[in-house]
């Protein structure tokens, strides 16, 4: 059983640094955005000590739904950079100190944040035009007086040689595109664009019954259909308090 901790937003970065250094939580397994309704918007972090396999689950939240902000942990775990961008994309939570607070999957002109419970789908009719490329990153910083400012930096300079790799390239399987800056055959910079075949499965599941969602989990990854369905079934069984047979438990441990 994982240890569970709730940390106030104002102490999050300090306490997460203690977990990383003091308890050797060197692996951020996942970082998930949450909408708890009246209790606020927040994030759940799953941390692991790769030596002992000890796990800690950390949660934090903000009650400010109009302008939700939380400290970034991307300077503690590098892998948090894309996870925090995903949370911003779907929940609108901005992470203070994150080096690149752009959307990750959705268009930059998307209105609203689709995984919020109060999201209005009518705000985004089907667009038949291409989105304009964004060549600047957004950095959010807290000043000494407590005020929050936004800084922008240019991704590529005017004299850089830029090429696209994907989404049609065989190596990217149609799911993402890279913009790369080249110096000869050396890649100097790489800008990742995801979400080309994103289908909003998580949002669709909110309005379906448990049995109806099983077919959708199979489609998340055509190379991992069984694992995704299996994980969802285990989650549903645990939430409902269902006791499965010994045979099923044995298969869970071997799959």
PLM features: what roles do these ranges have?
Residues 1-186:
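Terminal low-complexity/charged segments
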């Amino acid at each position: 059983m994982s240890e569970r901790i709730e940390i106030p937003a104002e102490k999050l970065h300090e306490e997460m640094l203690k977990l990383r250094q003091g308890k050797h939580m060197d692996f951020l397994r996942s970082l998930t955005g949450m909408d708890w309704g009246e209790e606020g918007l927040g994030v759940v972090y799953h941390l692991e000590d790769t030596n002992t396999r000890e796990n800690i689950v950390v949660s934090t939240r903000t009650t400010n739904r109009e302008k939700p902000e939380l400290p970034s942990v991307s300077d503690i775990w590098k892998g948090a950079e894309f996870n925090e961008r995903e949370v911003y994309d779907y929940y609108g939570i901005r992470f203070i100190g994150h080096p690149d607070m752009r959307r990750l999957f959705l268009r930059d002109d998307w209105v609203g944040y689709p995984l919020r419970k109060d999201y209005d789908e009518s705000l985004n009719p089907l667009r038949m035009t291409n989105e304009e490329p964004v060549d600047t990153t957004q950095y959010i910083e807290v000043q000494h007086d407590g005020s929050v400012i936004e800084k922008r930096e240019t991704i590529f300079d005017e004299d850089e040689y830029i090429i696209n790799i994907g989404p049609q390239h065989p190596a990217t399987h149609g799911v993402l595109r890279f913009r790369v800056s080249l110096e000869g055959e050396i890649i100097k910079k790489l800008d990742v664009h995801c979400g080309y075949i994103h289908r909003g499965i998580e949002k669709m599941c909110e309005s379906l019954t448990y049995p109806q969602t099983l077919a959708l989990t199979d489609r998340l990854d055509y190379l991992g259909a069984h694992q995704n369905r299996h994980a969802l079934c285990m989650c549903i069984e645990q939430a409902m308090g269902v006791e499965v047979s010994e045979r099923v438990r044995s298969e869970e441990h071997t799959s």
